[in-house]
Amino acid sequence: MKKQADYIKRIEIKGLWGRKNISWDLRADVNILSGVNGIGKSTILNNSVRYLNELEGHALTNGVQPGVSFVFSPEDANFIRFDVIRSFDRPLINSGLLEKIGNSNVKTELDWQLYLLQRRYLDYQVNIGNRIIELLTSGVIEDQARAAEVSRPKTKFQDLMDDLFSETGKKINRRSNEILFEQDGDILTPYQLSSGEKQMLVILLTVLVQDNQPFALLMDA
């Protein structure tokens, strides 16, 4: 039986590059892996992501995989929900992918992440909309009060975006189902933001669409 973890307590990698053993004890909130270029930070992240992907759908005792193992909290959990953010704004070079997308605005890796997140954001809105309708029509007074709480994370996300972009006069368009911004009377798509603004949007939007569920966010910056 699958049991979801709240967070990863430890990552262990045996024989990294055939010579190093890595054991990384993790906090429940924020963990930073730092060091000079070439020390293996991205390699550790990539190995972790690869084996976390393999865990999905498999009842593996406490996350053990050949060469890589995870200790979860609680320790009898055998998988974890996770997302990966890579904040490099390099041009996309996969011509087949660009043709498949059919969106000329998607030109960089950050654009691609935003494109995928837009679709998840639409699904998120449908889900919370359905929950609000269910609560409002239940006939239970307490449920009607809870309905306002369902949309609170989305409102908080919008408020945060407005605050972060306040110096450039950008505000998120709260009437649109898609992520759009207003600036001096113009409508901007996320693809028109600066690289730094795209990075902030990707991080906050990734967290929002988790819908308050426990998950691990891995970032390569």
Which functions belong to the PLM regions below?
Residues G38-I39:
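ATP-binding Walker
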Residues S42:
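Walker A/P-loop
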Residues Y51, L193-L218:
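GG-anchored amphipathic helix commonly corresponding to the ABC/SMC/Rad50 NBD signature/C-loop
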Residues M161, M219-A221:
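Conserved Walker B
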